[in-house]
Structure formats: structure tokens, C-alpha cells
Amino acid sequence: MIMSDRLTAFKELIQAGGAKRPADLIIKNGQLVNVMTAEIYPAEVAIYQGKIVAVDPDVSAYQGTETRVIDAKQQYIVPGLIDGHIHVECSKLSMTSFAEAVVPHGTTSIISGLDEYISVIGVDGLSEIFKEVDQLPMRVFWGAPFKTPYTIPASTIADNIDSTVQAQLQKRSDVYGVWETVREAVETLDEDTLKTLLNAQDNHVPVWGCAPMATGTKLNEYLMSGVRVDHESYDHQELLEKVRKGINVVIRESSVTHFLAENIRAITETNGQIARHVSFCTDDVNAMDIVNKGHLDHLVRLAIAAGVAPMTAIQMATINSAEAYRIDDQVGLIAPGRNADILLVSDLEAFEIKRVLAKGQPVATDGHINQSIERPVRPASLANTIIREAVQASDFEYHVAADASQVTVQTIASEGPFVRHAKTKTLTVEDGIVQIDPAKDVALISVLERFGKNGNQSLGFTSGWTLKKGAMASTAAPDDNNIIVMGVNPDDMALAVNTLIERDGGQVVVADGQILSFLPLPIAGIVSDVTPAELAVQEEGILKASQAIGSEVVDPMFYMTFLPITAIPDLAITDLGNVDCNELRLFDPILTIQ
């Protein structure tokens, strides 16, 4: 919008605030939940051009002949909810489908780095995503990733962000912070990262962090970087220490990590005064959970059930995030000048959302979007992103000396999505090929570069999955989104990977040469335009298929896709090879050969 148009619109908003222009919409007969003052009292709200222009006992002066009036029927008027940290692409829903999923549950704003998109289509490709977001009843506050790739050592993605690119991004008006600054990059004094952080200081751009299990001197060292927000506390003592040391902490309750019950103890058992410095996020959430449980509204209910007062829980889902991310001039509270993202809630204890207004318009009622949102026409840049030749079964054979009879291997033992330890296993060797043994709970794991850069492929061993047969694979695997495949049969592993290459992305489970379940991800190989309900059914199909090949993990496919993240201790695997996340180096999974 050019300056003259902005000035005209700005003048109109000011006039509307002075009741010199009639409101577009008025909410009457409601109880305002004032998250700034922790009060609840009768109030009316006037809205003009998507902005709140008045919050008073009586806004009759703002009503014109064409003003729409909503009777709140004594329901509670609550600010729209804010997800304080989310890799929205991990839902496998496009931005449009994701908005359809979460807006009826009261989520009207999200904080995201859109880093999964960047790994595939680059920063320039985000222009298409921002166009899509502009048409949605949901706001995205974008934090530009501190660098890409995040992995140490650096793995392969389609497009890299370094400090030079970051310096340019920090000048953009749509960049609200530096996203996901991992502690290891600070600890190792990575100069490119440090340049970005110094630029952020100069440009007054807030830095958002990622520091799991950082306490004591590790935390002190990390905080010298200028980080102000962190979403990685594994227990309530860690959360408390971080708040005491000046961090705004975001409690994560995702589809794969459930930290709310433990983290909330810092408020309910230790010090309730810290609550205003704590907020919520879902980080990585799938469609099944959104459809079956809700989104931020679910977290509010969990907090209330854990003993948090409803007002406090609502603050954690609204104003706390807004203040932590310095966007409280736009969202997080119901006050003049703020965006008109508003919920009508019938019961604060049950936190039952009856109506959602976003950008000043009623968009959802009783948990359902008022009308389906049209999907944009997708450009060619978002399709055909799997640039990889077909593979063979022999690509999934781990070769050692031809005269070897057995090997001792170090497996990446999964004890949950964000807990991975080393476990030693002994495997037999036949004709120089290590034999994968399901009876010993060992599977082969491989990551294949899929951007046409170098053709990298890694091989390693993993345990804890109880696979009995077959394989499963995905082109959506944060934060690099290369192809990851796990299996106990080379032929099935090759079939799984080739299926993803041929079908331009998705997730697949195979066994005995047959495809048991396939979930298509045609947009950048990471997301889909189907409805949330449709994707939830597809996810359930993948889950049942992975259970059919023996896995007893809660969500095997989702858990597997996190194996390339090197910020999660202790071990990972990328297209470069097996990674010791503590030493930040590659390691050979073969320990001994006999």
C-alpha cells in the first residue's frame, strides 16, 4: 500500500476511534476478559476495518445505520489465541488447510519461521506463502531463521540463509524476530551466527531461541547472545531457572512431546508469580490431534485442569505471547488500536469457544469454519521438488569387509521423539553385508538428499521401533526435509523411497513389496491442500500401517521424521551421516568388526 493510501486509512481509523465514523461491527451484552488487568467486567466492543476502535460500557455512539450488531448473550469476550512457536508445515497442512483447522479452535495468530518451506523453496519462494496467508483469517508473525540449515555439521537443503541474507531480512517490515537460534551455534562461537545476532542488536530485532536442557553455565553462556524467548524446557526446574534469568518461556505441548503437565508445576507448585512470563506453543502438531483435541484451546483446558486459574491460562495463550514477541501493539488483548481477533466463550473453566472473529469478521461458530476457504492456484515452484534418481535395494545394504562374520554397531536408540541415546547391538555379517535383525529391534535408517544438489545418502542403525518387517519413508522431515527411510528389508526400503520420488512427495509404509498406506504431500513435498479431516484420516492410515509392520511407538512416522534434527540430544542422522549431537561431529556407527 502506498503512503497516500495508508494515510487515508490511518485517518479513518483515528476518526472511527473518536466515533466520527460508524463502526462496521459491534459486540454487545458480553463480559470482557481483560488480560492486561486480569479483570472481567461488562463491556461492548466496536470494530472498524478490522481494528478495535472502542471498548467501553456503552458503544452506542459508534453504531450507524449499517453497523452489524452481535449479541454476546453474556458470553465472555476473549482475545484470539496465539501459538507462540510452531513449525506449521509439520502439520502437513497447507497454510489454508491449517487455518481451517485451528481458527475454529480460537487460534488467530501464530509465530513461525516457515523454515520447513525455506529448506525446500528458499526465502524467495515464501512470497507465494505470504500471498496465501494474506487471504486467511489467521495472522503469521514471521521470524527469519537465524541460519539454514540448522544442523551441525551443516547438511544439505535447497537454499541456505547466512548472515548476509539475514542482514537483508532484518530490514523487512514483515520480519518480527530471529527464529530458532539454537544453543549449539552460540556455544561453538559460530561466527556467521554471531554476525546475525550482532545485526539483530543493531536493528533492535528480538532473538528467539532453542535451548533444550540448558541450565547453569550453559544457560548463562547462551543468554549472552541476547536471546529473549525459549520454547525448550524439559522440566519445571529448567523453566523456572530460565524465567529467573530473564527469558520468556514458551511451554510446548505438541503431538509428540507433552511437556505442559510437567512444566506447569513451576506455576502451580513453585511460584505463581512467574505465570505472566510463560506462554504456550504446539511446535509440531498433526491434523489428527487438532481434529480430535483442538489446538491452543486444548492447552488452555489442560492448564486449567492442572490447577491454573482460567484468567492466568488465557493470559498465557494471549497477552503473554504477544508481549514476549513484542507484538502486543497488534494482538493479544482487546483494546483500541489492536486487531479485531476475538473469541466468544461460554464457559471459562471449560473454555468452550462458541464464536471466532478474525480480522474483524465472524469466521467460525461452534468449532466449525463458517465457510470453506478457497485454495490458491499453486505455482510450479511448489511442485516437482523431489529431484532424485530412483534407488535400488542395494543402496540400503551396509557393507563391511567381505570376510567379516559379525559387527558391533552403535544404534540411534529412540526413547521418545526428543530423547535419543546410543545403544550397542551385535549383528551378523553375510558376504560383507550387515544383516538387519528385527529380533534384536534393529532397523536400518537412511537419509537421501532430494534437492538435486549432491546425491548424498547416509546409512545408520536405529533401535526402539520394534519393526518386524517392511519400511516407512517421508519427504517431510524437519528441518532439512530430505527423504528419510527406515526399514528392515532393503527391497521394501527401495520401494518406499521410489514411491515418494515417483509421486512427488509424501509419506509411505510398505511391506512384502506392497504399499500399505500412502499420504500424498504434493506441495513442496511437505504439505497438502486437503481438508484437516481428510488429512487426519490419511494420518490414521499411516499410523495403522506402521503398527501393522510391528512398531509399538506412539506415532512412528512422526517420531522418525525428527531423527535428522541435530539440536535434539544425543544422536541424529542427516544426509551427511550419523551425528553425535553432543560433540557436534559425524561418527561411524560400526564400532567393531570380527
From Swiss-Prot:
Q: InterPro entries, from UniProt? A: Adenine_deam (IPR006679), Adenine_deam_C (IPR026912), Amidohydro-rel (IPR006680), Metal-dep_hydrolase_composite (IPR011059), Metal_Hydrolase (IPR032466)
Q: Does the keyword Manganese apply?
A: yes
Enzyme Commission number(s) of this protein:
3.5.4.2
Keywords for the protein's UniProt record, in alphabetical order? Hydrolase, Manganese
- The answer to whether keyword Disulfide bond applies is no
One MF annotation (Gene Ontology) recorded for this entry: adenine deaminase activity
Gene3D superfamilies xref list: Metal-dependent hydrolases, Urease, subunit C, domain 1
List required co-factors. Mn(2+)
Q: Which GO terms describe its biological process?
A: adenine catabolic process
Reactions the enzyme catalyzes: adenine + H2O + H(+) = hypoxanthine + NH4(+)
Q: Which Pfam families did the record assign?
A: Adenine_deam_C (PF13382), Amidohydro_1 (PF01979)
Q: Which family is annotated?
A: Belongs to the metallo-dependent hydrolases superfamily. Adenine deaminase family.
Name of the protein this chain belongs to: Adenine deaminase 1
Species of origin: Latilactobacillus sakei subsp. sakei (strain 23K)
